[in-house]
Structures are given as structure tokens and as C-alpha cells.
Amino acid sequence: MSKISFSPEKKDRKKKIRSILQGIFLIIILITTIKALFSFTKYDRFSDEILSPTEETGFIALSYFGVDRDGNNTLISTKNLEAQLEALKNNGYVTIEQQDILDYYTKGKKLPSKSLFLLFEDGRRDTAIFAQKIMEKLNFKGTILTYAGNLISDDPKFLDGEDLLDLAKSTFWELGTNGYRLSYINVFNKESQYLGELDSLEFSKISNTIDREYNHYLMDYIRDEYGVPKETYEEMNNRIDYDYEEMCRIYESEIYKIPSLYALMHANTGKFGTNDKVSSINEKWINELFNMNFNREGFSLNDRDSSIYDLTRIQPQSYWSTNHLLMRIWDDTKSNMSFIVGDEKKAFNFEKISGEAEFVNDKIILTSMPKGRGALKLKTDSKYKNVTVSTILKGNIIGSQGIHLRANDNQSKGIYIQLQNNHINIFDDNNKIYSFNLSEFEENKDKEKFDIKDRRDRLLDVKLYDNKITVVIDDKIVV
């Protein structure tokens, strides 16, 4: 019987090698974890070399409701946010800070030729996490807005005071506020039933049933179902004063100062509220507490003629394409803009008539001109008389899109199948020959009132043969 002998030295050597490999593996895991949790990148401010030659050059402001990994009806996806901000960077935009805006209006200092002020308005943790990774990549800086009440709430999805201090230290964030709380008054549902006052949680639970006829907490008197104030002037004054005082108390307790930037909810009232007396109280507090106020929404450009307490921003919707945002900014600024084309090989098959088109996989994202239309023409040497078309028309219910068949160059002749405001219309040489309300296919046939944000994708099949046309919507024969 043979004997096998083991060398203690060899065994120890194997243990040492195994320990070294395990140590290296743990170090790699540790480094990866640290990189995921902490950022070592610092924001690099723009150089004075790119300042505009004129003091008149203003800035655009973009304000996102919030960021979600996949996106939803309100929050933009990380993919879309990165695409939009990257397109702006490629067009020469750099981010500016609150101090730059203050110096622009109070000291007449110049800004970069293409200046972008970036805001995020929901104060959510996931917004800060997802947005910062993108801003680090692009060397962009933003302002995170919060409601003071959320800093001391038990809801973990909102940033607290410690979070805000950490964000400010990262160099990629500045702080701003929407006030003390998000709350609603004078609310009606879509059936015109009076709901009264709702907090943000109550509002969000039934938001799909609420009519656009409502107000934010600091905008008006609290009123009954007939529009009659339920409070005296003194009660209204005390109510609004309380919100500003609580906001100050919480911020000074949690982050040791009141943010210098305010965005009054809601925008576009003309002043600082929908009632003159309410507006005067808000105006007093705004001027006393803040260096600047974003008071309007819908336009991106602020210039020398704007008031620092009446600034405007554009709020990109979560469903906007990159070209839609670029088109809105181009319309506001009239500055040169490079739009996104996407798949250039597929784009080569089409002639652009108006607007801008992005080709992504099997999709064409067509963006219309401001107050105009977007149109593409398929390049072909053939004159198709009989055709079959199958496509999905994606987008919002409110609006118009369609397909021209057998059309001449200016589309004055031919067949036009139009989807407009939940109706299907068919035109022959610009004469409407058929119209059908698609609500007839729905469970709620009587619904005619749609919100501008309501979305509906439609599967459209069209067969045109000689003088006969067949149109099928969502597998239902229309004509």
C-alpha cells in the first residue's frame, strides 16, 4: 500500500493565494459600492471665455416635475431626461447658477450665449439620485425644489434636511422651495361636484376624476361651491402668513437657512395669486424672503426685460420627445438648433416637408412646427394607386395626425385619413366625406371632455383599392 505525503509549505502557500484573491475581490466590491453610493466628481463651472458679447443675452429655464427610472404620466424617465439634456449640451448650452441670475439682474453681468437654468420640482429622493448621475455625466448643475413640510414628514420618498445639505455639498445642486406644503382648495370633480379642500395625497388618489377647476392653497380665498368666500380677509391673511412662517421655521431648523429661490404654486396667475388681495400678501412675503421667484410657466426664455420676481420656465411633460422640447426652445429663443434625426438610413427614405422627424427602430417621431404642422413624404418613383397601410398612431387624444394617400405635392388632392380629438375623419380632395366619433367604441360613450394630457394609441389599418376605402381602428371597422 502506497503512502501519499502532504507538504505543509505547499498547503500554506495555497491558503495565502486564496486569501489574496479573496482580498482583491472584496476590495473590488468595496470600490464598486463606494462609487455607487458616493460621488467623487465635482461640478466644473463654465469659463468666462464663453460669455456673451452683449449684456442683453438672457437664459432659458427648464423645470422637471421629477425623475423616475422608467417614467410615468408625471415623472420623466432617466432615458428621456438624459436624451433631452444631452441634446441641449450638444447644442452648446451650459448650466448657470442662482448667483448668475441674481448678478444678471442686479449688477448687469453677462451670461454665456446659451445659458440653461435647470430645476426639479418634486423634492423626491429618486429624482435627486437619478438626475445627479446624468448631471455629473454632462457637467450640469440644477436646483432641487422642496416643500418645507415634506422635510419633516415620515414619507421616505421625500428628501429631508440632511439630504439637502448633502446635495449642496456635492456641488451639483442648489436649493429652492415651493413653499410650506402642496395643498388644494376650491376643488371640483369632472361631474361639477364640490370637493372643497384636499391635501396632496387626497388629490393624487382621485386626480383622474378632478376637473381643471381648482386652485392651490396660497392662490385665493377658500370658497364654497357657489364661489363665495368661506373666510374673512383677516382669516385669509392669517392662513397665508402661517404657511410662510412655518416654511421659514422648518428650513431654518433643518438646513439652517431659507432657500433664496422660490417657485410660487401655481404659475401664470398674472400676479402672485388669482385674487388681488391674496396676491398682495404673497408679494409682500416673496419680496421679503427670496432673491428670485419663478412665477410663470410655458415659455423658457428670460431676458433683461423680465422681472427677477416674475421669471418663467418651461415644464417638459414626461411624454415629450427630445425634438418637441428643442422645438419649444427654438421657438422661444430663435437661436440655431440642431434636432435629433436618429436612424439616418431610414430618414433617407423620407422627404421632410415641415417640422422635424426622429427615426427610432420602427417608429417615426414627428414634431410639428410651432402653431403649424409636421409632415413627411415617402420617397418613391412609383405612383401607388392601390395601397394597404397598417400603423400605430401614438400620442394624446387631443390633437391631430393622419395619412395622405394618392396625394399631390401640396396635399390639395388625394385621400386624407385624419385622427383628430378622438374623431376619425376622411377627406377626398380636402372635402370631408366621412366622420366618426371613436367614443362610440368606448364603454363611456358620452365622454367628450378630455384632458390635454390624456393619451391613447390607435391601431390604424387602411385599404384603398380603386374607388373603395376600408378603415379599421383598433380592429373595429369604421368604414
PLM regions: where:
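N-terminal Lys/Arg-rich, disordered targeting/topogenic segments
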Residues: 1-18
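Hydrophobic membrane-insertion alpha-helices, especially the h-region
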Residues: 19-39
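Metal-dependent polysaccharide deacetylase catalytic core of the NodB/CE4 family, i.e.
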Residues: 65-68, 115, 136-269, 311
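His/Asp/Glu-enriched short active-site or ligand-binding loop at hydrolase and phosphoryl-transfer sites
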Residues: 146, 202-207, 254-319
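Extracellular carbohydrate-recognition regions
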Residues: 327-356
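Secretory/extracellular carbohydrate-interaction modules
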Residues: 368-434
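Short tryptophan-centered beta-strand motifs in secreted/extracellular beta-sheet-rich domains
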Residues: 389-391, 449-473
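Short, aromatic/His-centered strand-loop micro-motif at the edge of beta-sheets
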Residues: 432-459
